[in-house]
């Protein structure tokens, strides 16, 4: 391992011990905000610290085994220990490289999840509903909370558009690779000839950031319309103009919110989504600049990003970004998404490692 990397790991190890001591300090415990921040830092440093300590132990074993090679009686055992120590060193160094990759500061944040029906009419809306249910089931398995911010239901089920806030540990980091186009191939229930139709939806995943970190939005740049809500809601539907539509004139971004009965609450929700969308659009521009120099697996939520195809007759799901095909569609639609998410996370990390190794010392 490069001396510069060892030096960096030693510094992180020292910081881990320092933070551990601070967390036991009564003065720090009394300051809730500082205690929380240090607890997060400690959790982030724990894995790399543990892995580095294990690597150091293996290096000691390696040195001991090399010394034993000079002893004829111990040589055979030493060669076996040397082989094991070298294999362990290689594995631990790979783990440490991944742990040292630059962290996306947004990865630990909650996120806004948008699913929109694209081409395919009613069938696209039904599939948007299926996708949203899939993500909701996945959230349940990870003990995340899903709160619908806005829902525009399809005429025959599903959603023309649904926006939800997903809250929990590491939400954005897990879901960010879902942004892009999702295509379905199946026979719609309304299809009497049994023909397979192709429909599409787009998914956009944006980090939910604190208000202080959102781009400044000038009131003069906004066009705000009120209208009567439609869809579920019983006797309260269509009685007041509580639904809100906000248009950000410089970017053309439009957000609607009609889930709450209060116009004030709908406006607050719409503004939080609008801020996240504007920030996401700015980040997408930066990603496109990066993509000109290297492959970019992170989608922008645009329909031109073709992420996956869900083929129901074949029970197949294909991720086109990494050429991964699984014949486990039923499980995927029930929310078992780790089998799709983890391979693309690993591919993304491999790309990051390749970019880092190409940089000069």
From Swiss-Prot:
GO terms for molecular function: translation release factor activity, codon specific. The keyword Cytoplasm applies. SMART domains: PCRF (SM00937). Signal peptide: none annotated. Keywords: Cytoplasm, Methylation, Protein biosynthesis. Peptide chain release factor 1 directs the termination of translation in response to the peptide chain termination codons UAG and UAA. The modification N5-methylglutamine is found at residue 235. NCBIfam families: prfA, PRK00591.1. It comes from Serratia proteamaculans (strain 568). InterPro entries: PCRF, Pep_chain_release_fac_I, Pep_chain_release_fac_I_sf, Prokaryotic/Mito_RF, RF-1. Belongs to the prokaryotic/mitochondrial release factor family. Methylated by PrmC. Methylation increases the termination efficiency of RF1. This is Peptide chain release factor 1. Its main location: cytoplasm.
């Amino acid at each position: 391992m490069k001396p510069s990397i060892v030096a960096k790991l030693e510094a992180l190890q020292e910081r881990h011990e320092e933070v551990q001591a601070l967390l036991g300090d009564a003065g720090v415990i009394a300051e809730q905000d500082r205690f929380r921040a240090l607890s997060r830092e400690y959790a982030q440093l724990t894995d790399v610290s543990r892995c580095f300590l294990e690597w150091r132990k293996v290096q000691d074993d390696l040195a001991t085994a090399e010394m034993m090679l000079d002893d004829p009686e111990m040589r055979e055992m030493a060669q076996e220990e040397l082989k094991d120590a070298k294999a362990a060193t290689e594995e631990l160094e790979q783990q440490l490289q991944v742990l040292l990759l630059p962290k996306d500061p947004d990865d630990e944040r909650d996120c806004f999840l948008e699913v929109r029906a694209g081409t395919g009419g009613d069938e696209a809306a039904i599939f948007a509903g299926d996708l949203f249910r899939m993500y909701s089931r996945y959230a349940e398995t990870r003990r995340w909370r899903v709160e619908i911010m806005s829902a525009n239901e399809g005429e025959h089920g599903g959603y023309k558009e649904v926006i939800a806030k997903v809250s929990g540990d590491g939400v954005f980091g897990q879901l960010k690779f879902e942004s892009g186009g999702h295509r379905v191939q199946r026979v719609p229930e309304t299809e009497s000839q049994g023909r397979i139709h192709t429909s599409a939806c787009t998914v956009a995943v944006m980090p939910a950031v604190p208000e202080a970190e959102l781009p400044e939005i000038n009131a003069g740049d906004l066009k705000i319309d009120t209208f009567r809500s439609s869809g579920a809601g019983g006797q309260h539907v269509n009685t007041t103009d509580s639904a809100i539509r906000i248009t950000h004139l410089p970017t053309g971004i439009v957000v609607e919110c009609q889930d709450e009965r209060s116009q004030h609450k709908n406006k607050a929700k719409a503004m939080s989504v609008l801020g996240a969308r504007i920030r996401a659009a700015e980040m997408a521009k930066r990603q496109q600049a990066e993509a000109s120099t290297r492959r970019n697996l992170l989608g922008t939520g645009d329909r031109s990003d073709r992420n996956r195809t869900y083929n129901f007759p074949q029970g197949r799901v294909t991720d086109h970004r990494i050429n991964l095909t699984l014949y486990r569609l039923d499980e995927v639609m029930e929310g078992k998404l780790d089998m799709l998410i983890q391979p693309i996370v690993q591919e993304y990390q491999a790309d990051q490692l390749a970019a880092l190794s190409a940089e000069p010392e």
